[in-house]
């Protein structure tokens, strides 16, 4: 039975998460404030190097193999697209969340899409000096798994909401 301030304070420790869940339920998730302009541009070649370095590739001939030539390059290029001189995704958080979403949902590889998507996502965050705050990872291993699976299981019409959810994870 909840009968003291200590019990209530435990719940208060998760107030941001509970508020995000409530906003999701009501379909009113917003982009977090204080987003960072990107300083580092990811390349297709870097992504291929990263994939080649992953240990999963040693035990599989299909891990990281693109289903069609240029699929991953198209995804990487898409997060840097602009319209009327304005970036479609102007912040690191928007680029990172969309990069993760597109690789997971577009499924450009025969095998390893979620692992590759998560790896490129954290690599991109790290290159933009956003993966660690005060020496601590901003996304725990379990959170990385959860958001990657959340995106994988989401419906296409939920894209904008899912991207905003990921962006909120990055702002905490």
Question: What are these model-derived regions, one by one?
Answer:
Residues 1-172:
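FIC/Doc superfamily catalytic core
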